[in-house]
Regions:
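A compositional/structural signature for long, glycine/proline-rich flexible linkers
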Residues: 1-265
Length: 265
């Protein structure tokens, strides 16, 4: 295949996956079916972002992975999810610097490995934070570097979570990430590279849907109107949280009242 045909083939395979996955959203309830298709479009966008756009591990930048217009899995509307691409192979290392405002509820920094594997994590309670809120984290897979977060070598992403109770009063943290090494010149775009990244986007899209459908099947078997604990390995969570889910059905003119007791800090 020539350079145009390589890209066309990759795009065709991606579109075939989209059409195949679209059939899984053929749900009897109209609203659920519409939401399923919107979720498909959002995950397509997220997959392309992850493997075509925001992929420079030599010049990483933090970006919001979720927001008002892209909901993924069980993300919390009262949290910011900031992610940056990294590559810990061949002794590479990174420095994360930031400022945590006073009164911040929670900050967690986590590495993710191949296939979404949950890596090491550190929270604001474990960080060395200055009086001005400044902190610094060293990320490496080399124990001799004495890193703050020691990876296995397959990590491709660092994610920072910040939780809020009142966004109007609690400012977002300042954050930056830097590759600690000689930054090479950017490589020119070529068809083989782009075709490979499109294929990786396709695989991510299918993986997201398979994991989401698996989670749906598991959760839908839970007893109705009863909160149950969800395994922390389900849908890229943080191990610092406990996740409880209640499966419910509402008839016309019904409502749900959720009550509980908050634990003392």
């Amino acid at each position: 295949m020539n350079h145009n045909e390589i890209i066309t083939h990759a795009l065709n395979q991606l579109m075939k996956s989209v059409l195949k996955l679209e059939k899984t959203t053929n749900i009897p309830q109209e609203l659920d079916a519409v939401e399923g298709r919107r979720f498909l479009l959002r995950m397509l966008s997220a997959s392309v972002d992850s493997f075509v756009e925001y992929i420079d591990a030599d010049r990483p930048q933090f970006r919001h992975s979720e927001g008002p217009h892209r909901k993924m899995f069980g993300d919390c509307p009262d949290a910011d999810y900031l992610q940056a691409t990294i590559d810990l192979r061949n002794g590479r290392s990174y420095r994360v610097r930031g400022t945590i405002p006073q009164g911040t509820n929670y900050v967690g920094v986590m590495l993710y490995g191949r296939g979404g594997r949950i890596g090491v994590c550190i929270t604001d309670e474990q960080l060395e934070i200055g009086n001005d809120g400044l902190f610094e984290i060293l990320i490496s897979a080399n124990p001799e570097d004495n890193p703050t977060l020691l990876g296995n070598g397959d990590e491709h992403m660092v994610m920072v979570r910040q939780y809020f109770t009142d966004r109007n009063k609690q400012p977002p943290m300042e954050l930056e990430v830097e590759f600690l090494g000689d930054v090479p010149e950017p490589k020119p775009l070529n068809s083989a590279w782009l075709a490979k990244r499109i294929e990786l986007s396709r695989r991510m899209l299918e993986s997201i849907f398979m994991r989401t459908l698996d989670a749906y099947r598991r959760i839908s078997n839970f007893p109705k109107n009863t909160f149950v604990d969800v395994p922390v390995d389900l849908l890229f969570p943080t191990p610092d949280n406990t996740y409880k889910i209640c499966w419910y059905e509402l008839e016309t003119h019904q409502m749900i009242i959720v009550s509980g007791i908050l634990p003392k800090a």
